[in-house]
């Protein structure tokens, strides 16, 4: 894999809760940031804090795309957030019990990212009915929609041809090997750039992004 591949790998920093980290993501060249509205998540952000980030990005050129993340939210909660905040994409979990197929297809917006949790080998056929612009292939956890800090067996996704972001247990130490091994369209990190659950570490964010770009 050549250096250009690393330079082109998309980077999503998920679970951002404060403006300073959002600024660092922009300065370092992240492609997406995730604002988490999952009720049970330590990364859940308030509408007020989310609005500060959104306003800064809208007033600043070359900002990352804004992704609003939902899991086990009611359709009413999703409506409230998406109607209140400017955003580029909505992220949802494929087996979210609170969303019907109609919700997923017609309600969530024009641009979507679907998170598919992997605990066994999957094939292109398994993903054909997912109506989203992008996929995130993430570790499976019974009670969490993501952000577990656990990797999964990358051989389980070795035959997937569709464009996807790799998630699950990534950090600055293993992300370059993950890119070389899996060759994803992009990478997605949450807990791997934190000092404690829900608290992003600025240096870890910077190191993660730079390691992706430099292939370190």
Curated annotation (Swiss-Prot):
Biological process terms in GO annotation: L-tryptophan biosynthetic process
Keywords in alphabetical order: Amino-acid biosynthesis, Aromatic amino acid biosynthesis, Isomerase, Tryptophan biosynthesis
Pathway in which this enzyme or protein is active: Amino-acid biosynthesis; L-tryptophan biosynthesis; L-tryptophan from chorismate: step 3/5
Top-tier EC class: isomerase
Superkingdom field: Bacteria
Family matches, as InterPro entries: Aldolase_TIM (IPR013785), PRAI_dom (IPR001240), RibuloseP-bd_barrel (IPR011060), TrpF_fam (IPR044643)
Gene Ontology MF term list: phosphoribosylanthranilate isomerase activity
SUPFAM superfamilies per the UniProt record, alphabetical: Ribulose-phoshate binding barrel (SSF51366)
EC number(s) stated in the UniProt entry for this protein: 5.3.1.24
Gene3D superfamilies: Aldolase class I (3.20.20.70)
Catalytic activity: N-(5-phospho-beta-D-ribosyl)anthranilate = 1-(2-carboxyphenylamino)-1-deoxy-D-ribulose 5-phosphate
PANTHER family, alphabetized: N-(5'-PHOSPHORIBOSYL)ANTHRANILATE ISOMERASE
Family assignment from sequence similarity: Belongs to the TrpF family.
Family matches, as HAMAP family: PRAI (MF_00135)
Protein's UniProt name: N-(5'-phosphoribosyl)anthranilate isomerase
